[in-house]
């Protein structure tokens, strides 16, 4: 009888997991001077998240592949192991491993070193912010007055404009943490704090990063003119990429599209370049090349780990004409910065340059629409940003123009400037860049047009400011 009872007890422990109270869990009581305590909660020392009484969560065990189900009970987390399977779709960013609970609908991410958060979205090594800090995902949690920030998930913030339980909280960087964020485009990251017994928002003391090297170059004045633009050197456009694809029915490869280096391991391009489906290992990206097929002394070549085409790309209107390629490398860094290879700066979400601002495009495309071949040398063109009123169907032979597009064209004409600068076939996926704050900044991706170099007919580009969230989210997947 005793043996039977022991056997049953052992089965229960194996099936359900041994419930226990972790000594490292601490009771979390937040107090405001002169006010009442507003709730005892549990703080998970592994995930650094706080939970309300009776709230439950999953967490990965340290140094193992097991997962625990925890519940906050009177200030202590009571946990037991539960069975899990690999998630059916990617949910974790920055290389995290996703585990789906077998008996209930919840998942947990096992994060690599340097990342934490529900989806490994928090970068524990981020010590400063860039621009206004809209994309800051670090762990700074102190306001300028040295007061500790309040957790965005706190019930005290339920009626506040921004909190960790609002529908788009995750995209704004909000969640179960008290880290400084900038969900509303303020001048810098901020958080909610309690001062003199009252709630208020306050800017954080997180430092701004030193100015990045993105968008810098050693510009060489073009010496030779060509139909549709000017022959140039890669050092004038070090963010220019060339994408090649293997031939399907013969050996060798063919030039596919242009691309734009936006970080060490990521290249931005146009979605319509992949209307024919390719496997990632059928693609190659070349950086630092002045001549389309002739190798350069400082060029860098990469295989493609994966590529992501916007799910809502419309191959009829070319709406959402954007795609990302992740370069393959044996180390965390892919492209090595040099005079011939450098990332372009991405714009701030609210960047709006004046109408008719002069910008540049570059690519290895055809000289004109009737040309049988692509250009052998990289070319550049100088165009101006059109007002939205001129970026409309009636100026583009009644073709559809959406809010995700912008227009730019060469406004020079006449006998003095018979050569109208414009993008053409083969330039697709390449950059439209403009000077902003002394750095060249990406405004558009070469997408489509009516002919090439037609007088008073602008080229159409994917509007990059509309896709900053999409770019950030997919780079972290």
Curated annotation (Swiss-Prot):
Q: What are the Kringle domain coordinates in residue numbering?
A: 128-209
Q: Which GO terms describe its molecular function?
A: calcium ion binding; serine-type endopeptidase activity
Give the record's keywords alphabetically.
Disulfide bond, EGF-like domain, Glycoprotein, Hydrolase, Kringle, Plasminogen activation, Protease, Secreted, Serine protease, Signal
Q: Which InterPro entries match?
A: EGF-like_Ca-bd_dom, EGF-like_dom, Fibronectin_type1, Kringle, Kringle-like, Kringle_CS, Kringle_sf, Peptidase_S1_PA
Q: Which cysteines are joined by disulfide bonds?
A: 42-72, 70-79, 87-98, 92-109, 111-120, 128-209, 149-191, 180-204, 214-345, 257-273, 265-334, 359-434, 391-407, 424-452
Description of its domains: The fibronectin type-I domain mediates binding to fibrin, and the kringle domain apparently mediates fibrin-induced stimulation of activity.
The name under which this protein is listed is Salivary plasminogen activator alpha 1
Give the species this sequence originates from.
Desmodus rotundus
């Amino acid at each position: 009888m005793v043996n039977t009872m022991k056997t049953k007890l052992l089965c229960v422990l194996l099936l359900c997991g041994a419930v226990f109270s972790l000594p490292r869990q601490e009771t979390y009581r937040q107090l405001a001077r002169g006010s009442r305590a507003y709730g005892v909660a549990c703080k998970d020392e592994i995930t650094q998240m706080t939970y309300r009484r009776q709230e439950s969560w999953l967490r990965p065990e340290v140094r193992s592949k097991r997962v625990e189900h925890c519940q906050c009970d009177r200030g202590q987390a009571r946990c037991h192991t539960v069975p899990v399977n690999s998630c059916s779709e990617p949910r974790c960013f920055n290389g995290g491993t996703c585990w789906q609970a077998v008996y209930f609908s919840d998942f947990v991410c096992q994060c690599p070193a340097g990342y934490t958060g529900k989806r490994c979205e928090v970068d524990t090594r981020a010590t400063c912010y860039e621009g206004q800090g809209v994309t800051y995902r670090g762990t700074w949690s102190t306001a300028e007055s040295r007061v500790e920030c309040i957790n965005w998930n706190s019930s005290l913030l339920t009626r506040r404009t921004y909190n960790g339980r609002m529908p788009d909280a995750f995209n704004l960087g909000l969640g179960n943490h008290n880290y400084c964020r900038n969900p509303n485009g303020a001048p810098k990251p901020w958080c909610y704090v309690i001062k003199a017994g009252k709630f208020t928002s306050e800017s954080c003391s997180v430092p701004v990063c030193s100015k990045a090297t993105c968008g810098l170059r050693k510009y060489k004045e073009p010496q030779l003119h060509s139909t549709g633009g000017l022959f140039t050197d890669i050092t004038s456009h070090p963010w220019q990429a060339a994408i090649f694809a293997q031939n399907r029915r013969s050996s060798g490869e063919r030039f596919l599209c242009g691309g734009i280096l936006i970080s060490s391991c990521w290249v931005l391009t146009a979605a319509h370049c992949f209307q024919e489906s390719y496997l990632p290992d059928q693609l190659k990206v070349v950086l630092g090349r002045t001549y389309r097929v002739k190798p350069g002394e400082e060029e860098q070549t990469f295989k493609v780990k994966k590529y992501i085409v916007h799910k809502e790309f419309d191959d009829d209107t070319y709406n959402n004409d954007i795609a990302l390629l992740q370069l393959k490398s044996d180390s965390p860094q892919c492209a090595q910065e040099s005079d011939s290879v450098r990332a372009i700066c991405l714009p701030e979400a609210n960047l709006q340059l004046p109408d008719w601002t002069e910008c540049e495009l570059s690519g290895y495309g055809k000289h004109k629409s009737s040309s049988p071949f692509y250009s052998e040398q990289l070319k550049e063109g100088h165009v101006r940003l059109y007002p939205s009123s001129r970026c409309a169907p009636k100026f583009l032979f009644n073709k559809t123009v959406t809010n995700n597009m912008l227009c730019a064209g060469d406004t020079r004409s006449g006998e003095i400037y018979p050569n109208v600068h414009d993008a053409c076939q083969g330039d697709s996926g390449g950059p439209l860049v403009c000077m902003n704050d002394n750095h060249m900044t990406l405004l558009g991706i070469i997408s489509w047009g009516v002919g090439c170099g037609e007088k008073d007919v602008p080229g159409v580009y994917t509007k990059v400011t509309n896709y900053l969230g999409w770019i950030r989210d997919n780079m972290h997947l």
